[in-house]
Amino acid sequence: MKETVEGTSPRICQIWGAGQYYGHEEASPDAAVIIAADGGADEAASRGVTPDLVVGDFDSITTDRSAFVDLGGNDGDSTHSPGAPAPDESRPSSADSPSSMRRPSSQGATTSPESPSPTKYRRLPAEKDDTDMLAAVKLGWEAGCRIFRIYGGLGGRMDHTLANLNMISLVAAAGGRASLYGDGIIVTAISRGFLSFAPWRSGERAMVSVLSATDRSEGINERGLKYQVEGMTMTNLELTGVSNEFLPNTPARIGLDRGIIYVTYPDAAPMPSWHTDITPATSLGHLDTRPSRWLTRPGRDQVEEETDPTTSPVQGSE
């Protein structure tokens, strides 16, 4: 079943991360773009999936990149002609554009008689604010994708799992939808809109949970579930929405008016249709390739603070 937005089929990006896998991940035939974040390229390759693009600092990948096309510009290893301007490290290159990342229309069949383009890769520095996963999502967004199916984004390192939850909230705020696939469960985030689930044989205790990702989420509706609510307000300090249940052969709808909510549901559930009132942002921001400007510089900042007259104690204040 295809994911739809207001009756349309939006451009879908499938991302392979370097987190935990559970044995049932596979290629999405309807994905317009497939991107691997660093070591996710190994997981994709082990399942016979060829990404359009591999991005990251390459601290976890083992896949041979000799056949990949290097987009360059960020790793310090790539060179450019003497006297030529250095590549813009923050913007996706023209090679990352939608026209350069074409996918088969279905597995085993391409959209043209030509062979698929070789996998491209873009190396990023290790010291940067964005995770490799967020870089992959940003590039997918630049390629026109608004729905993201992410493998390897749950489990493994807890800090990365938490970062990925923040990331799918970012996508929701920008007018898109990203889903993290786990062990029999999918986690997604939505804002100012709703998810609609078709009737299905849910069986007993087919759990669906709703939690606020923002400080406050308002106008929450849960219809067609065991516990139904209308116009509820949740905060991110409440756990009220945990462990609701699908009802067998009953359509369900989950939505909200303001804020962002997380929704978790079984991967056996039908793919929900999705509506949002948010006009998609043109960008999720430039690729981050440098350490945060907020970082202190050990030693130097301390000296500057001690010698700065504006920070010296006022005479007689002690």
Q: How would you name each of these model-derived features?
A:
Residues 170-187:
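Short, acidic/small-residue loops that bind anionic groups at enzyme active sites
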Residues 158-169:
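Short Gly/Thr/Asp-enriched flexible loops that form oxyanion-binding sites at enzyme active sites
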Residues 45, 141-144:
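Non-catalytic positions within long, well-ordered alpha-helices that form the structural scaffold/packing
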Residues 21, 154-160:
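Gly/Ser/Thr-rich loops at beta-strand to alpha-helix junctions
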Residues 112-115, 119-142:
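Short phosphate-binding loop-to-helix
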Residues 70-118, 286-289, 300, 305-314:
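Intrinsically disordered, low-complexity terminal tails and inter-domain linkers enriched
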Residues 1-73:
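N-terminal beta-strand-loop-alpha-helix module at the start
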Residues 183, 190-318:
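Long, charged alpha-helical interface segments
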